[in-house]
Design a protein with these regions (language model features):
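Conserved anion-binding
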Residues: 2, 68-72, 77-153, 158-161, ...
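Conserved beta-strand positions in the central sheet of alpha/beta enzyme cores
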Residues: 6, 32, 57, 85, ...
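Conserved, mostly hydrophobic/aromatic
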Residues: 7, 31, 61, 84, ...
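Short, acidic/polar
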Residues: 12-24, 67-75, 134-146, 191-198
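Structural motif
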Residues: 26, 52, 79, 150, ...
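Glycine-rich phosphate-binding active-site loops on the catalytic face of alpha/beta enzymes
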Residues: 79-92, 189-222
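C-terminal helical cap(s) of enzyme catalytic domains, especially alpha/beta-barrels
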Residues: 95-101, 105, 200, 213-232
C-alpha cells in the first residue's frame, strides 16, 4: 500500500454511512470503521462496505489479556479488512497473541497496527491521569519499538511523532496518523495536530481524517483536497 487518506466514517448507523459514501461517485476512499459504527451495526457493516470495493481499517483498539485478544482477532480475520489495531499498552504477549490469532491458515493476515497514545492525550493528561512521568514523545518511541519487536506492522501516532518513529524503527514501519486538520479548520478535541501537507512532509504513511471531511459542506471536495495535499 502507498500513501493514502483514510476517511473516518464515525457514523451511528449504516444508513448514515451509505448516504455519505454514495456521494463519492467513481471513487472508493479508504474507510475507517470505528467503535460507534461497528457496535451499532456489527460485522455486517464491514462486509457491506467491503462489497462496495472499499479498503477498510477496522479501528477497535483491542486491549485485554493475551488469550482474549488472540481469540477476538481470530474472529476479525474472517472479515477481510485491510488494517486493524490494538493498544500497545497491552504489552508484548498480547501483541504476539493478536498476531497469532489474526494470521490465517495460508499465512496471510491484515496489517496489524498498535495505538501508542491517543491524539487527545497531552503531556498534562499523561502525567496526571495515566501516571506516566515521561515526555509524551519518549513514551511513543518506547511503544513503537515494543510494537516492532513484537512483529507488528506499525503504529498509530500523532503526525508530530511520525518522522521520529521512522528514524527509530525504519521507513518500512508504518505510521498511521489521526489528528489531521486543514490549516483553516477547527482542531476539535485533538491536542496534537498537523495539516495533510505537514503530515506528508514529516513522513506519515497514512492520515486518518474524520470531521474535516464528513462534516464538510462538500465532503467530496474536502476529500479531494486532502488527497491533493497528502498524496500528490
Amino acid at each position: 500500500m502507498g500513501k493514502d487518506v483514510i476517511v473516518a466514517c464515525d457514523f451511528a448507523s449504516a444508513e448514515q454511512t451509505f448516504a455519505f459514501l454514495d456521494q463519492f461517485t467513481g471513487r472508493k476512499p479508504f474507510v475507517k470503521i470505528g467503535m460507534e459504527l461497528y457496535y451499532a451495526e456489527g460485522p455486517e457493516i464491514v462486509r457491506q462496505i467491503k462489497a462496495r470495493g472499499h479498503k477498510i481499517f477496522l479501528d477497535l483498539k483491542l486491549h485485554d489479556i493475551p488469550n482474549t485478544v488472540k481469540k477476538a482477532m481470530a474472529v476479525l480475520r474472517n472479515l477481510d479488512v485491510d488494517i486493524t489495531n490494538l493498544h500497545a499498552a497491552g504489552a508484548t504477549a498480547m501483541m504476539k497473541g493478536a498476531l497469532e490469532g489474526l494470521t490465517r491458515e495460508d499465512g496471510t493476515r491484515p496489517l496489524l497496527i498498535a495505538v501508542t497514545q491517543l491524539t487527545s492525550t497531552d503531556q498534562e493528561a499523561l502525567e496526571k491521569d495515566i501516571l506516566i512521568d515521561k515526555p509524551i514523545d519518549e513514551v511513543v518511541m518506547h511503544y513503537a519499538e515494543t510494537t516492532k519487536n513484537a512483529g507488528l506492522d506499525g503504529i498509530v501516532c500523532s503526525p508530530l511523532e511520525a518522522g521520529k518513529v521512522h528514524d527509530r524503527c525504519g521507513q518500512n514501519f508504518l505510521t498511521i496518523t489521526p489528528g489531521v486538520r486543514f490549516a483553516d479548520g477547527d482542531v476539535g478535541d485533538q491536542k496534537r495536530v498537523m495539516t495533510p501537507a505537514q503530515a506528508k512532509a514529516i513522513g506519515s504513511d497514512y492520515i486518518v481524517v474524520g470531521r474535516p471531511i464528513t462534516a464538510a459542506a462538500d465532503p467530496v471536495a474536502a476529500y479531494e483536497r486532502c488527497v491533493a495535499e497528502f498524496c500528490d
